[in-house]
């Protein structure tokens, strides 16, 4: 999409075999960087955010759906982060969350794309952030069943120790699966490391 739809000149795609990560030392943060924190199918994930410099020129755009509530995220390194608030805790993926850093908001308010943005995707009007969407205003009415389900799940999250508790649970589950796989010679992880 970056090359074919957005036609961003000089785009670099770090292509590696399934289950591997590219060499993160080669990522050019003079440009914007788009990445997935944790691949659901392969299990490949960035180990942490240490590879993202504090003084980067570009913004980071992160799909964190399989990482939020399961991995420790360094929010100071993430400028535009998305995840489905249902899928991340076991529900269907129908509604999304967008978290923007001040740097991302500044870019939205100062950059004018060369093409029209459909109204449903616009986040600025007259070079100012449309902040209502971040205060609970919605474009469409979300399913109240989904909202109630999520509130229920958040109560469960709170009961197991909150965000830290879900990360601990994810790490414990990984340890159990790793121990089991290490005992069976015909099984292995799709992810190399």
Where are these regions (language model features)?
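Conserved small-domain helix->loop->beta segment predominantly found in fold-type I
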Residues: 157, 164-166, 176-193
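Membrane helical hairpin/interfacial module
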Residues: 1-9
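Conserved active-site segment immediately N-terminal to the catalytic lysine
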Residues: 61, 75-86, 96
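Active-site phosphate-binding strand-loop segment of PLP-dependent enzymes
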Residues: 11-68, 80
């Amino acid at each position: 999409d970056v090359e074919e739809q957005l036609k961003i000149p000089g785009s670099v795609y770090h292509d590696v075999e399934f289950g591997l990560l590219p060499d993160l030392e080669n990522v050019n943060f003079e440009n914007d960087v788009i990445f997935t924190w944790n691949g659901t199918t392969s299990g490949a994930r960035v180990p942490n955010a240490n590879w993202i410099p504090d003084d980067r020129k570009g913004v980071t755009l992160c799909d964190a759906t399989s990482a939020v509530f399961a991995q420790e995220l360094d929010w100071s390194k993430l400028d535009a982060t998305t995840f489905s608030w249902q899928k991340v805790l076991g529900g269907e993926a129908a509604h999304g969350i967008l978290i923007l850093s001040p740097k991302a908001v500044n870019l939205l308010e100062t950059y004018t794309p060369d093409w029209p943005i459909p109204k449903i995707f616009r986040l600025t009007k007259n070079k100012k952030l449309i902040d209502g969407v971040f205060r609970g205003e919605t474009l469409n009415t979300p399913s109240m069943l989904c909202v109630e389900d999520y509130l229920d799940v958040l109560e469960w999250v709170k009961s197991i120790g909150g965000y830290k508790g879900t990360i601990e649970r994810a790490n414990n589950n990984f340890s159990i699966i790793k121990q089991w796989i290490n005992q069976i010679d015909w099984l292995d992880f799709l992810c190399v490391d």
